[in-house]
Amino acid sequence: MDLCRWALGVDYPKRINASGGRYHFKDDWEFYDTLVTNFEYDDALITWEGMCCQGKQYYGRGRGLTVHGTKGTVLLDRGGYQVYDLNDKLLTEVKAERSAATQDLRSIDSMTTAHFQNFVNAIRSGEALHCPIADGQISVTTLLLSNIAWKYNRTLRLDTSNGHIQNDAEAMTMWRREYEKGWEPKL
């Protein structure tokens, strides 16, 4: 989500809708295993597809992102990236120095190592974070809002300045949780 937002120059979407369900496993897990979410902006759209239980790879990748633009397409995952023009001609290809399978969330590769090293360097020496906390928070909140859209099976309309759900008191109850006595965070 960070990279999609960065590529489009957007923050919070104005609308989010999500549909999917628990189709692969029949167990007591409460969340979906298949989900398609649309994040609508004034002049852009991000579509997120989560299909963790099926083996089909898109563009030869297990996970990653694809940005379709007016002049071409970029495919990016932990193995590197490829840039194509509108005629599907490969213009650029860059491979990561050490990549791992992208079919699951357990992969550790050069990108993971670089993220952790940057975080440690920020703590130790004040190095700038590659993804500032405030920016990462927008991405995480946006993805969590897609869970709310899925749970209530409706489109959420958002205040684009802060991500708050507009005109939907029921959905907004999911904005924060009630903590068990003794477990309340103390800041």
Q: Which ranges hold each PLM region?
A:
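Contiguous beta-strand/loop segments that form the cofactor/metal-binding neighborhood of enzyme cores
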Residues: 1-134, 140-187
